[in-house]
Amino acid sequence: MKWALALLLGLACSWGRADTPSFSLVFAGDTTLDDAAGALIARGGDPLAAVASLFDNADVRVANLECVVATTGEPVDKNYTFRAHPQVLPVLRRHLDGVTLANNHSGDYGRAAFAEMLGWLQAANLAQAGGGRNLSEAHAPWLVERAGLRVALLSYNEFMPRSFEADHDAPGIAWSEDEQVVADIQRARQQHRADLVVVFMHWGWENETTANGRQRQLARLLINAGADAIIGGHPHVTQDVELYQGKPIIYSVGNFVMKETDNDRQRQAWVLRMTFDRAGASGFSTHPVRLDDDGIPHPDPHRQSPCWRRGQGEPGLCTH
């Protein structure tokens, strides 16, 4: 009789684990498709082919699209401007479900080109966070429902000088105004009934491998407001990771597709995989990639990189 009871209890526990809803997200960093990568696509190639397996079996696959995808517009007055042809989008859609747009290159060719890009993304069935035809759209969450979980994805730019933010009647990106971001997180929880909130930040200083005080202060503010995880980019190098109140902060995953690199550190990056359940983030792994001379990513499996599972304490290092 005791063995039968034990068997029933074991089955009940296994059923409970099977019924626990879970969600997985893969995020890749700064992605420009205007240069060698765009030329490769024009020839029928795929710049993401070598790392395609890193996106396998994820519920949502995301990258930071750090170029405007359009055929119109004129370059603004700045050192670097990036514009890719819409022909890149089918290849992007092959690997991704959506992109983040809140960065300092979405406005490289002006508002009309940005609005054109929004149309191309929609036509390609690529979702986006952090951009819109007006202020409300730019701050609206990208909502994903998987396995009984509703997940809100938000994206913000904090790279100064403050520019190209959406207005009530003008397309643009979501700017990281503290009070507004807190309100957006709370709205995602209350109005959109999100079980989980993930915030993507474009922040920090280029080539700095350690997050600065402002990044740490803001990450804590957003977690206190209700975010379950913070994922960052813009420095073009990887930065440190940490837990705050048991919630992961990945300050920068580095580049993903980027020919314009200044040093070897900018060619070393991570593709992040993070898992969630109803209680929040349950773990993450960072998969090292290395960019070649054309800015195309390739696996770099022998390099250690941060990883973590709930219950283990602070993040450690893993080799994949």
Regions found by a protein language model. Name each.
Residues 4-12:
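Bacterial N-terminal signal peptides
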Residues 15, 19-320:
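Acidic, metal/ion-coordinating pockets
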